[in-house]
Design a protein with these regions (language model features):
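Juxtamembrane cytosolic interface motif at the C-terminal end of transmembrane helices
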Residues: 18-26
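Core hydrophobic alpha-helical membrane-spanning segments
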Residues: 9-19
Length: 166
């Protein structure tokens, strides 16, 4: 009887320890979601609110190489925002100047960051700060006017380094 009690106690403690370990283990900080172009602002708000410094979301065409990426920056407690990053690479070469023209036509300031190596030679970078409307509208226009996709197109939102919902 006493040995049965000890055995049950050992299994009980082991189950509790395993449960605590599984509950406290690091959870994934990335996830995929299929969205319509009308959901871009919601996704960018999620990145801004729950993303870690340098967290990002990539909006991409399923089964295609075309994408638009936004990253989050945190410079200090009061200075955080979103940055659009559009690469100059073999797949995007045909779109690169069109993205620049779109930004210039909208009066949006951008900078070009040289990477100096690899297939991605440079990035167009736009600091949207906390302007979710501007960021979402620009992203949507890149998909519709530059990539020439139908407004009803669904894209994949791939989040990286974004805290899970509570």
């Amino acid at each position: 009887m006493r040995s049965e009690f000890i055995l049950i106690a050992i299994f009980g403690v082991a189950a509790i320890v395993a449960g605590v370990f599984l509950y406290r283990r690091p959870r994934p900080v990335e996830h995929l979601e299929e969205i319509g172009l009308g959901d871009l602002k919601r996704c960018l708000a999620l990145l801004l609110q729950r993303g870690y410094d340098l967290g990002f979301v990539v909006f991409e065409m399923p089964g295609d190489q075309r994408f638009v990426e936004f990253s989050k920056y945190v410079r200090d407690q009061h200075n955080r925002g979103l940055q659009l990053d559009f690469p100059r690479s073999p797949w995007s070469e045909q779109y690169y100047e069109q993205v620049k023209s779109l930004l210039e036509g909208k009066g949006i300031r951008y900078q070009v960051e040289d990477t100096r190596n690899g297939p991605v030679r440079e990035f167009i970078q736009v600091d949207f700060g906390q302007d979710l409307d501007g960021a979402a509208a620009t992203c949507r226009e890149i998909f519709e006017r530059v990539f020439r996709v139908d407004p009803g197109t669904r894209v994949t939102a791939d989040y990286q380094h974004v805290a899970p919902a509570p």
